[in-house]
């Protein structure tokens, strides 16, 4: 079919293909099974379109969440070919192209097209593609994601913000709470205390909000143990799957910067790790491993228990000739130092 409005020519090629949808189905507290559904589709069909057709035409028992169908509500988030995404945003053509790109040469030429769909990770399954998001919402609540005016006088009409102040909130304000970042989070997988990237992205929104009066208490909370920002493993998965480009890791990093600007190295091991790393690299161009562990874990010889915990590792390194007995600065130490000092000056 060809349309020719003016000089522009738009060609629309109608392609029908058969795709096998492999859906991971599961009842609550039972083992998962894979069920396949063949479907005649077009490349432009969204995954949600296909799921609707499967439910309406083949299997009415299939359970999944949906609502807006337009990348607004976040309800239809699920794992599609191994990555968490919105079913209403992803289409058949792009998913098959991504699969072809990552497949081995042996499997690229097969004519059977398959798309695998599974429920979100890091949350228990209720049925099929529907997960229990209670812990997701509880972790969001843990960061108090709302403006606090407890220490301020509430104006008669409203809190006014400049366009510049409001612009700081735009990126995090785009979050639709779809759970894709939470599903992919490596830290959540191994650390049940970690509140998750969605919560910390919202947390930064509160830190950056000029109307909020609770910044110091918030930063104390987000700095605590590994449940807050120091629990992040910086795997970048949250940024890579976010459909709204909220960049949760970037927001977590901003909170860390706020904490590091206010805290001393002696306040906690997490803070000490960052500050000591920078100072050692600035001094020698790279890390002096003889000092790194002692300064961080041993807190500059103030933490006897921490120092004793290093002893077994130190002895094994000595026995195997792996302990660095001396340190030699790198050849580019001066350039590295100048770069770090330039960045520190720009940030101050």
Regions found by a protein language model. Give the residues of each.
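Ferredoxin-type iron-sulfur electron-transfer modules in oxidoreductases and energy-metabolism complexes
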Residues: 45-60, 101, 113-348
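Short, basic, low-complexity termini and linkers enriched in Ser/Thr/Gly/Pro
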Residues: 94, 100-111
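Eukaryote-biased recognition of intrinsically disordered, low-complexity regulatory segments
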Residues: 17-36
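Short, contiguous acidic and Ser/Thr-rich linear segments
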Residues: 35-46
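Short, Lys/Arg-enriched N-terminal segments with co-localized hydrophobic residues
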Residues: 2-16
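Short, structured protein-protein interaction patches enriched in aromatics and acidic/basic residues
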Residues: 63, 68-77
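Short strand-turn-strand beta-turns centered on an Asx-Gly dipeptide
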Residues: 24, 80-83
